[in-house]
Amino acid sequence: MTLNLCVLTPNRIIWDSEVKEIILSTNSGQIGVLPNHAPIATAVDIGILRIRLNDQWLTMALMGGFARIGNNEITILVNDAERGSDIDPQEAQRTLEIAEASLSRAEGKRQEIEANLALRRARTRVEAINVISY
């Protein structure tokens, strides 16, 4: 039995295919979804989406949004997303270093919040590349 997974951003469809299982980062922690999962709607945190296709696991960096699960269909609408395989490791590492430097130079609460958000996004992209398969 499989699940139909659709990952959408405002600009494009990132994924639309059948999967065996996913592990999704939500605002209240990670949840695993298998076929016949109870219906749920949840906020999606900045984090990693793990996708199992048969014996292979893939990763995707998600930048926050919402997910709806029901009737073996999963729809994830996010601000932005990248497949782990599409992320350039050197560029992701440079972005992480820039985000860390921006946080250390942040002045005022607003700059600190924006720098922390940029740092979370950068860390998620690096994690999507470096995650170890199950």
From Swiss-Prot:
Disulfide cross-links: none
Q: Which UniProt keywords apply?
A: ATP synthesis, CF(1), Chloroplast, Hydrogen ion transport, Ion transport, Membrane, Plastid, Thylakoid, Transport
Instruction: State if Amino-acid biosynthesis is listed as a keyword.
Output: no
Q: Which InterPro entries match?
A: ATP_synth_F1_dsu/esu, ATP_synth_F1_dsu/esu_N, ATP_synth_F1_esu_C, ATPsynth_dsu/esu_N
Q: Is Chloroplast given among the entry's keywords?
A: yes
Indicate the principal place this protein occupies in or around the cell.
plastid
Annotated localization: Plastid, Chloroplast thylakoid membrane
Q: Which residues cross the membrane?
A: none
Membrane topology term reads: Peripheral membrane protein
Coiled-coil residues: none
Summarize subunit and interaction data from the UniProt record for this chain: F-type ATPases have 2 components, CF(1) - the catalytic core - and CF(0) - the membrane proton channel. CF(1) has five subunits: alpha(3), beta(3), gamma(1), delta(1), epsilon(1). CF(0) has three main subunits: a, b and c.
Give the protein's recorded name: ATP synthase epsilon chain, chloroplastic
Q: GO cellular component annotations, sorted alphabetically?
A: chloroplast thylakoid membrane; proton-transporting ATP synthase complex
High-level lineage: Eukaryota, Viridiplantae, Streptophyta, Embryophyta, Tracheophyta
Q: Name one Pfam family in it.
A: ATP-synt_DE_N
The UniProt entry's sequence similarity note says:
Belongs to the ATPase epsilon chain family.
